[in-house]
């Protein structure tokens, strides 16, 4: 399942990516978000009731607390966290990350991270480097 979150739900979009879900963060106008959702077959997640009413395949999220937003999405769409997919997407740009050799990140991550971790991943688009705990 793929998502697009409206501009009020940037933190939720980031956490859906952490859980491995392909999630765009839309900062365009409502018509643009709907077009992307339709073209890419994405569920539109929004806090905007009007936007929700304009697009059938949308989910209205109420409240501002992240934990409740995540729980609401997971429960409403019957989603589960799949640990195989968790941490598989860049939290910044949504691109799938790929594993990278430890020697390739030397000098590019904090020394403590380099010394205490053996597994690293990189986003091929924005070049952000990840390790367990980032």
Where do the protein language model's features map onto the residues?
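A short secondary-structure junction signal
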Residues: 102-105, 134
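Short metal-coordination and nucleic-acid-contact micro-motifs, chiefly zinc-binding Cys/His arrays
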Residues: 83-87, 116-119
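Short functional micro-motifs and their immediate structural scaffolds
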Residues: 95-99, 131
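Long, charged N-terminal interaction/targeting segments
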Residues: 1-85
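Metal-cofactor-dependent catalytic cores
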Residues: 25, 125-134
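Short cysteine-rich clusters marking metal-coordination/redox-active sites
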Residues: 90-93, 123-126
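Short linker/helix segments within small regulatory modules
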Residues: 106-120
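Short, glycine-/small-residue-rich phosphate/pyrophosphate-handling segment
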Residues: 88-90, 101
């Amino acid at each position: 399942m793929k998502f697009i979150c409206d501009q009020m739900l940037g933190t939720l979009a980031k956490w859906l990516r952490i859980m491995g879900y392909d999630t765009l963060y839309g900062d365009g106008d409502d018509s643009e978000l709907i077009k992307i959702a339709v073209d890419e077959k994405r569920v539109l997640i929004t806090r905007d009731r009007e936007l929700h009413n304009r697009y059938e395949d949308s989910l209205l999220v109420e409240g501002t607390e992240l934990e409740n937003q995540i729980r609401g999405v997971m429960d409403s769409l019957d989603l589960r966290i799949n640990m195989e997919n968790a941490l598989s997407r860049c939290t910044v740009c949504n691109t799938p990350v790929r594993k990278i050799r430890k020697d390739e990140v030397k000098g590019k991550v904090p020394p403590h991270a380099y010394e205490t971790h053996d597994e690293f991943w990189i986003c091929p688009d924005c070049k952000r480097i990840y390790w367990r705990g980032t």
